[in-house]
C-alpha cells in the first residue's frame, strides 16, 4: 500500500520514452516510446471538447483516421455550423443531416442505413452511429464487430471502447451513416482497432477485414 501512496503523491508523472540503453548497455542507444493509459484510450480518435460536438468529432475521426485528411474537431465543427442553425445546434447538437451535408461538400458520398442484426455484423467500414448513453443522444464511430460479437467503438467522449453486441443494440437507434470517398486506407488506424488487451490478441479476435469501400462493399458477403 505504501508504494501505491508514494506513486499517487508524485507531483509529475508523464508518458515519454524509456532509455533502455542506460539500464541495459548491450542494447546501446535504444529508446522505447511509452504510451499513457489516457493516450491509449483516445488513440486514433478526435476528442470532443464541447457538449454538442460529438457529431463533429465523429466526422473528424473518420476523415482523419480512415481517409488521412488533415482535419480536427474544430475545423469540422466550424464547417458544419456554417450550414446549420447555431441555436439548434447549441440545444440539440448536430444531426446526421448536418454531417451528411458537410461531408458531401467535401466530395464524399454519404448514405444512411437501417439494419437488422445480421446485416449489422457484415459492416466492413467505419461508420457513424447514434447511441443513447444514460438518456443522452451521442454520436460515436463504429469501427468493427469481431467474430465473437464484440463491438469496437471510437467514442469522442469516452475513448476506445469494446462492448458486447447486446449492449450495443440496447443503446443504438438502428441507423448508421456510411461515408465513402477517395483516399480510403484499409490499413489506416481506424479500420483496424487494437485489441483491448494481449489476452484478446491471443484469442485471435481481430475484427473482420475491411477493404476499399464502395456501396457494394460496405457490407461483407457470406462465403
How does the language model describe each region?
Residues 3-11:
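Sec-dependent N-terminal signal peptides
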Residues 19-38, 80-181, 186-190:
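Conserved active-site-adjacent core of cysteine acyl-enzyme catalytic domains
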Residues 175-223:
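Low-complexity, Gly/Ser/Thr/Pro-rich intrinsically disordered linker/tail segments
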